């Protein structure tokens, strides 16, 4: 079979990916010419770097449970990148509205709604989020008893979804709260993404936008995250055994994970120790003198 080779093919793919991340849907589906592309960058990029908006789904505790990115869906089912995200001058009124740019969509501003797996969450009227109107109070289109979308879906932060708010803020407003803003990037509709960790849920992030860094007492504790998961589960029983039995310290050392061992070697060593222990118990049982019944 003949092998096809294209000179510079990988470079062309990288250039197109960069073009799509910068332009987004602003070209209307027709690629800009090189001259139009350069003119677009001269016009839009300075405005985008200066007036970037950070969008997050925030819990009542102040944690950003979800940092919105270009592909994050809105209540209207359209992506964040399909909403208005670039402003020549930021509006003075708050909250900032980011209307949907898709034709005939009545969405007046981006509104994040979480998913339950891959499906929309349900309202208290038992209908899904995409069965509600995207305008006004988000009333249900399938029934008349629903006055507006209201879901008791529980977020990973243990707070219900209806207590969260979609927050749109500027770089200065975010810095004033001590939250990360990342580097200035030319890409469209970056929202609240500031790094790879932004893809994680808020309760899993260790920066100021999430749960925060662990305390010093946690990092210095003997059962810290450097321990093996087996030790983290059985640390207290091992600790009690070390005090109650003379050979407890030997057992504790045997249970410790050696950094050079991989997982299979670790559990194999534990398995061999258990076999030796069973053989020793069996040998001691067989070595006991038989009991004789005297008349």
Swiss-Prot record:
Residue ranges, annotated region (Disordered): 272-295
Compositional bias of kind Basic and acidic residues: 272-283
Superkingdom in the source lineage: Eukaryota
Family: Belongs to the FAM221 family.
Stated name of the protein: Protein FAM221A
The organism of origin for this protein: Xenopus tropicalis
Encoding gene, per UniProt annotation: fam221a
